[in-house]
Regions:
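Bacterial N-terminal signal peptides
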Residues: 1-4
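Extracellular glycan-interacting surfaces
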Residues: 7-260
């Protein structure tokens, strides 16, 4: 037995030493990327949003994504969930980020940048957001008017449609917009998982509007099924009505305006 063990020991060759090079692993981001926003006119300007890992701007020179919200403290980590991003079609330097991870947490904030995302002014808003809730991969809930960069619309999950007339510095609810809240069985558990997604995307129709007031015709879609979920305004957002003949058996997720 001992002899066998001695032979086995003699058959094992020493392992050659290997030189390893150690370096830090670059962790440049986190969260699930649920939306990418491109500027319609300026090539290379794009942003992406994540459910709970902040927002990022594409850096064409270095071919990488630059984090924009790493300055947010742990105490305010609810703002790391990004609900929507909007870029001003007339001025690519103006970008707006709607922040709030859960509707069960504190109210969200709109971060306004007028220098391409290098600095931000924080505007606290009186409604919650749900960047990490159901429907996070829907279209953009916040959109800048392509004919008047002062005007921004923001569709919320639980609190209707809101509008800013001063580049995001203040917000007021559009009280004429219909109630699109989703009704659930009161016996269901009260958790974010069974709360509605609310308004999910906004589209402007710029055809025929050249008076400087902004875009006259605006479409807003809500994540509803079995009832009207697509609405239009033909008077600059003052009044709203359901679009006729719309299918109600599906939930809308994104919208694109066609030529007809």
């Amino acid at each position: 037995m001992l002899g066998g063990m001695s032979m086995l020991a003699q058959d094992i060759s020493p392992v050659n030493s290997v030189s390893y090079e150690w370096k830090s692993v670059p962790i440049v981001g986190g969260g699930f990327v649920d939306g990418i926003v491109f500027h319609p006119e300026a090539p290379g300007i794009r942003y992406c949003r994540t459910d709970m890992g902040g927002a990022y701007r594409w850096d064409a020179a270095s071919c990488q994504w630059t984090p924009l919200l790493d300055w947010i403290s742990l105490d305010e980590s609810n703002l790391q969930g990004v609900e929507s991003i909007a870029i001003d079609p007339q001025n690519p330097q103006n970008v707006y980020i709607a922040c709030g991870t859960y509707t069960s947490s504190s109210n969200g904030a709109i971060l306004c940048s007028y220098d391409g995302g290098r600095t931000f002014a924080r505007v606290d808003v009186p409604f919650t957001m749900g960047g990490n809730e159901n429907g996070r991969g829907n279209g953009e809930r916040m959109m800048v008017d392509p004919q008047n960069g002062n005007i921004i619309y923001m569709g919320t999950r639980l609190h209707g449609l809101w509008r800013s007339m001063d580049k995001g510095q203040s917000w007021a609810r559009v009280v004429s917009f219909p109630d699109v809240s989703e009704k659930f069985n009161p016996a269901d558990r009260a958790a974010w998982g069974n709360r509605g997604s609310g308004i999910v995307c906004i589209v402007y129709d710029v055809q025929g509007t050249q008076d400087g007031r902004g875009t006259r015709d605006i479409y807003v879609a809500a994540s509803l099924m079995g009832r009207e979920n697509l609405f239009v305004s033909h008077d600059y957002g003052e009044s709203w009505r359901p679009v006729g003949g719309q299918p109600v058996q599906y939930r809308p997720t994104h919208m694109v305006l066609t030529g007809d």
